[in-house]
A protein has these predicted regions:
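Transmembrane alpha-helix interface motif
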Residues: 1-49, 53, 58-61, 154, ...
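Short, flexible active-site loop motifs that bind/organize anionic cofactors or intermediates
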Residues: 14, 65, 106, 135, ...
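Amphipathic alpha-helical protein-protein interaction surfaces
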Residues: 21, 68-71, 141, 145, ...
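Structural signal for the C-terminal ends of transmembrane alpha-helices
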Residues: 37-38, 65-70
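Small-residue-enriched core segments of transmembrane alpha-helices in multipass membrane transport
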Residues: 55-66, 79-87
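Interfacial helix-loop-helix linkers and transmembrane-helix boundary segments
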Residues: 71-79
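Juxtamembrane/interface alpha-helical elements of multi-pass membrane proteins
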Residues: 78-196
């Protein structure tokens, strides 16, 4: 459970850590848009431009990680945490995509070249999105994320949307992700000390073995929620009141540099898509 990096803040003094939280949130959204803008093309020329687009997104993440002074292993843990989902998605693409040239066939399972390309495309897209999202949570504290979301959603207050309450919910959710992961790890170790086996057997047996973990975790979650509610109540917390900020967010030259960089990434991906499309049209 400690392999999941999403939601865990890594304190450091770096270019990215000192950026405005609002700019970081918008930059991650723009980065995800750039990843989705990379088109899926099944021709050889189109695939080359497609992976150039993914390469540009990966280069952007690597530069951002270096500027954030976050260990690469810490960022890669986010991929390890969802490896099962990534592998399952790739298998479904490979075995159940009938379009393209058939490379192998067993019973109802057909492996085609298009299926392999789509599987690689899907793995690259999911991995890049998770890397970018985890970099946001690693370099931005839950309080900063909540303040950033509240500031960005401020115009919704005019239509009576509970912006502050929504930001508070997001902040608490992000704050409790690492707490619940640590609690899960502690319960699993306690169960293993009592002779529980979570590593052997098929997937159904492993899921069944996790039942003694889920029930204590659920009880612990409710207990922590009650403790947090009591703590907020004892401090007379009220989300409806106008609240001041200890640290006000201000944009600096770092945010301008990041904005130019993400705009350049999106323009580059769009240019690669257009070039790849034109190359395919010319060949046809």
């Amino acid at each position: 459970m400690k392999d999941v990096a999403f939601g865990q803040y890594y304190p450091a003094k770096s270019f990215v850590h000192n950026m405005d939280a609002r700019v970081k949130i918008l930059a991650v959204i723009a980065y995800i848009v750039a990843v989705f803008l990379v088109q899926s093309v099944t021709t050889a020329q189109g695939v080359a431009f497609q992976f150039l687009g993914f390469g540009a997104c990966l280069f952007f993440v690597l530069i951002a990680t270096l500027c954030a002074r976050v260990p690469f292993g810490k960022v890669l843990k986010s991929i390890k945490g969802i490896m099962f989902f990534i592998v399952l998605s790739a298998i479904l693409q490979i075995f159940f995509n009938a379009s393209g040239n058939v490379l192998a066939k067993w019973s109802f399972i057909t492996i085609t070249d298009v299926g392999l390309l789509n599987a690689g495309f899907l793995v690259a897209r999911i991995s890049l999105i998770v890397l970018g999202a985890s970099l946001l949570t690693l370099t931005t504290s839950p309080v900063e994320i909540a303040d950033g979301i509240e500031s960005l959603m401020y115009p919704l207050k005019f239509i009576k949307f509970p912006v502050h309450e929504f930001a508070l919910i997001m902040s608490i959710a992000l704050r409790f992700i690492p707490t619940l992961l640590d609690e899960t790890d502690r319960i699993i170790k306690a169960q293993k000390a009592r002779g529980a086996d979570f590593d052997s057997g098929n997937i159904l047996k492993r899921v069944k073995a996790l039942m003694p973990v889920l029930i204590p975790l659920l009880i612990s979650s409710f207990r922590r929620a009650d403790e947090l509610a009591d703590a907020m109540d004892s401090r007379c917390y009220s989300g409806s009141k106008v609240r001041t900020k200890y640290k006000k967010m201000r944009s600096t030259w770092r945010d301008l540099v990041a904005t130019v960089a993400i705009a350049g990434l999106i323009c580059g991906v769009v240019a690669l898509n257009v070039t790849g499309f034109l190359a395919v049209v010319v060949l046809l």
